[in-house]
Structure formats: C-alpha cells, structure tokens
Design a protein with these regions (language model features):
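Non-catalytic scaffold segments within catalytic domains of secreted glycoside hydrolases
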Residues: 1-255
Length: 255
C-alpha cells in the first residue's frame, strides 16, 4: 500500500517476495557461507504458510493497478532421484520447493531461478562426486538445470506463465560462462518449443557483486577490479549469438 503511489507507471512484472522458499529454509536469516540450499533443514510449515498468505495479500493490493503483473520467484533445483528413491525425492522436494510453486498457480507469472541439480537418496541429498566439475559456489556445473526447472515448474504451477528471473554461473573462466549460458538457454528454448509459456530471461548477473558474504563467487558478465573499475569480459561478446526475437522465438547461433 505504501509503494503503490509510485508504481503507477510500472508495466513489468513485480515479485512481492523473492525466493520465499529460501526465506523459509533460513527462517528469515542465517549466517555462514554454505551456498547449497539442499543442505538446509526443512522449513517451518508455519513460516511457509505465512509467506503464502503475505504473497497473496500483496498480489491483491498490486492488482489495484491493472498495468502491474505480479508473481513470486522460486529458487529451483533440478532434483533427481537415486534408483528406488522417487518417494524420498518427492517428500524432500515438496516442502522446499513445490509447496511454494503450487501457491503460484494462477498468478500473472512465476519466476524460475535455477542453477544446479541435487540427487536425493534414502537419507536425503547425495554428495556431489569428487570428479564432477564445480563452480565457484561449490555447485555442480550442470546447465540443463534450467530446462528441467522450467518443465517441472510448468507442471506444478498448472501452466502459469514463466519468467526466468535468475540463471548464471559463478566462475573465473569466461569460456565456461559462455558454454553454461548457451546450454542453459538451449534447454529453455527446447521447453518453449514444446509449448511452455516462457516470457523472458534475466541473467544473473551483469556485474560481479557481493554474494553470501563475499565477492569471491563471480557471477558477472562483466568483472569488477580493484577500485571498483569495470572490466569487460569475454562473456558479453561471446553471448552475442543468442537472439530473442519478437513473439518469443529464441535463436541460438554458433558460440
């Protein structure tokens, strides 16, 4: 209600709450540098329910301006079940992700924020293999996570339109940043070709920034050096082959 008077010219999507599942998992705040959400305990059901109520109330208020489109943004993981552990995966995934995705059904859009996959076994998350390629956050390098998350969200949110509100990689190697982003967007394009309504893609992020207590995980398409001087990276010209045309068609040329 307080900010509505300054939103009269807004015509883009607004998320009243960013990553409510992460808010619930951390109970509103936590310390430390553990970048892997799968390592966190299940959220308190009361906190999760309160977040859903707050989201719906915020959307009710925002709907007073018909130009504003609203929906919240979910931290998604491409969950995989180890053989015979499908039930355990569903029980693990539901309170951490699907509960919040279900609550978005019928919204103007739902934001998908995807970077990685997590395997679930009988006792919960399975450690990443020692020989797997990792990013600077310690996550497995897995570009297909975006396409998997888009497809899963489309089904759970009952065909609510999707905006990719975060996707990217923390790396010091711009060649791998280009590879990751090309392959992630290719998965998004395949989902769109299959009829999934994806209305936009936002990369995380343009510039390196302060992530989880450190400047170390460099997500930026452009880097920041000493003295906060902006330095061009190879990633920006390297991604010039990704073209998003009017009508939602995504064309990917040779990288």
């Amino acid at each position: 209600r307080y900010v509505m008077p300054i939103l009269h010219d807004v015509t883009v999507g607004l998320p009243p709450i960013n990553e409510p599942n992460m808010v619930a998992l951390t109970r509103g705040g936590t310390e430390g540098s553990d970048f892997v959400a799968a390592s966190l305990p299940a959220p308190d059901p009361d906190i999760s329910a309160t977040l859903v109520k707050a989201h719906r109330k915020a959307r009710e208020i925002l709907s007073g301006n018909p130009r504003i489109k609203s929906g919240w943004t979910i931290a998604c993981q491409a969950f995989h079940a180890m053989p015979g552990c499908e039930r355990e995966m569903e029980e693990y995934q539901y309170p951490r992700e699907d509960y919040f995705t279900e609550a978005a059904a019928g919204d103007d859009f739902i934001g998908v924020q995807a970077y990685l996959r997590t395997f679930i076994g009988k006792d919960g998350p399975v450690p990443i293999p020692e020989d797997a390629e990792r990013t600077l956050t310690g996550w497995e390098y897995f570009p297909p996570a975006l396409g998997i998350a888009i497809r899963h969200t489309w089904n759970v949110a009952k065909r609510t339109p999707i905006i990719v509100t975060e996707n990217g990689i923390a790396t010091a190697d711009d060649r791998r940043r280009i590879d990751y982003t090309f392959d992630a967007i290719a998965g998004m394009r395949d989902a769109m070709d299959d009829g999934i309504d994806v209305r936009g893609y936002l990369h995380w992020s343009l510039l390196d920034n302060y992530e989880w207590g450190s400047f170390a995980p460099t997500f930026g398409l452009a880097s920041l050096g000493q003295g906060h001087l902006r330095t061009s990276s190879e990633a920006i010209p390297g991604l010039a082959g990704v073209n998003c045309e009017n009508g939602g068609h995504v064309q990917i040329e040779d990288r």
